[in-house]
Swiss-Prot record:
<feature type="region of interest" description="Disordered">
    <location>
        <begin position="329"/>
        <end position="353"/>
    </location>
</feature>
<feature type="region of interest" description="Disordered">
    <location>
        <begin position="182"/>
        <end position="226"/>
    </location>
</feature>
<protein>
    <recommendedName>
        <fullName>Putative protein FAM157C</fullName>
    </recommendedName>
</protein>
<comment type="similarity">
    <text>Belongs to the FAM157 family.</text>
</comment>
<feature type="region of interest" description="Disordered">
    <location>
        <begin position="1"/>
        <end position="21"/>
    </location>
</feature>
Length: 387
């Protein structure tokens, strides 16, 4: 499809034939006749002087042919501009200033983690601050800068953490983030050439010092296909070629005993636990939720004992939140502690801060420990726990 119209009908310009009269929109014609500069520049082979310029030229030298004079002026101006540009370029090259074709990469003043737009988006959508915390970028930025939110709830958690009752990454308490899943995997300091780089969600594992015979080198010795075609598990282990898409990962080689389990989580061992949680616990739909429990449980820290299990069974039926994070679970199968939004509590008085002596039982996915926490984080009408 050519231009909207070529010329004013009747005035031929070279090989382009004028459109039939019925196709010429009156608006376009009007613009042409009025001499709209932009339209003229696009349509006419020669540019037409504006009336103001014509008047000026006429006032200067009435005897000369106005149009020729104007064209001469235009040509002179163009030549001058070209000369100036050429001079500037010469100067630049003589001073040996490198002119790069691409815009220079901006200096990152903030930490890489927060300045990256992908991470910002991840913050905005997946890390829901919940009750009364405005989830603006400004807040996230200020919190990233080392300021911790103040308030009764965070004070309480800080206290728990300092007493080693809450062995939990402080980062995930002060900054609302669902574990390391949102952080962009860092590029290795000395990346291998692209053919041998292992692509995986866990590119950070490439940061570890290469041991001889491990990783991609070992694969190359075995004559495997180029590793950009290899699928990898979260830890960087290669999925064998014939495996269907949904296959379970193989049992981990536990060379270092429990250390591997701990390094996978960002937090240390829980008090009183000697082994990683049972798979049933990980499979629980309500593993990361808080529940309303009777006053008897207030302030107690249960191990995964009969008492804890009993209270747990009792409270499953009246759970505050079933599992609103299923889609996140699917996207990020690693066990993490999801942010708990405040859930509305039935029958809580709106006027006073009383919660009817209720506390929250917190179950952590990664541990059999259950903690009963008094309700400090939420505003009056709500009950729940925020991380």
């Amino acid at each position: 499809m050519g231009p909207l119209f070529t010329t004013i009908p009747g005035a031929h310009s070279g090989p382009m034939r004028p459109l039939p009269k019925k196709h010429v929109e009156p608006m376009a014609v009007r613009q042409l006749l009025l001499g709209n500069a932009t339209m003229i520049r696009h349509t006419c082979p020669m540019s037409v002087p504006l009336s103001r310029q014509v008047k000026e030229v006429a006032a200067q030298k009435p005897s000369e042919d106005i149009y020729k004079n104007w064209r001469r002026q235009q040509q002179q101006q163009q030549q001058q501009q070209q000369q100036q540009q050429q001079q500037q370029l010469d100067l630049l090259f003589h001073q040996r200033i490198q002119i790069s074709l691409w815009p220079r990469k901006q200096k990152r003043r903030k930490t890489e983690q927060h300045s990256h737009s992908f991470v910002k988006k991840a913050f905005r959508f997946s890390a829901s601050p919940g009750c009364g915390r405005p989830s603006s970028n400004k807040m996230l930025r200020s919190m990233g800068g080392g300021q911790r939110p103040t308030g009764l709830g965070s004070e309480f958690f800080r206290l728990l953490h300092d007493l080693h009752l809450l062995a939990f990454p402080t980062k995930c308490i002060w900054i609302h983030r669902r574990g390391e899943a949102t952080a962009r995997p860092r590029a290795p300091e000395h990346p291998a050439p692209p053919a041998t780089a292992v692509r995986g969600r866990d590119a950070a594992s490439q940061n570890l010092k290469r041991r001889p015979g491990s990783g991609t080198d070992g694969l190359r010795l075995q004559g495997a296909e180029p590793s950009r075609l290899l699928r990898t598990y979260a830890g960087g282990a290669v999925i064998p070629t014939g495996t269907p898409e949904r296959a379970q990962p193989p049992p981990p080689q536990d060379l270092l005993g429990r250390r591997r389990w701990l390094s996978r989580n960002t937090w240390g061992p829980w008090p009183g636990t000697t082994q990683p949680p049972s798979p049933q616990l990980l499979r629980n739909d309500w593993g990361s939720c808080g529940f309303m429990v009777p006053e008897a449980a207030r302030g107690k820290v249960f191990q995964d004992s009969q008492e804890g299990a009993h209270i747990r069974r009792e409270t499953v039926s009246k759970s505050v939140c079933a599992e609103p994070w299923r889609h996140q679970r699917a996207r990020d199968p690693a066990p993490t502690n999801f942010p708990l939004k405040c859930q509305k509590q039935r029958g809580a008085s709106t006027s006073s801060g009383q919660h009817g002596g209720r506390v929250n039982l917190v179950f952590f996915i990664d541990s059999p420990t259950v903690i009963a926490v008094p309700d400090l984080q939420c505003p009056t009408k709500y009950s729940g726990i925020l991380y």
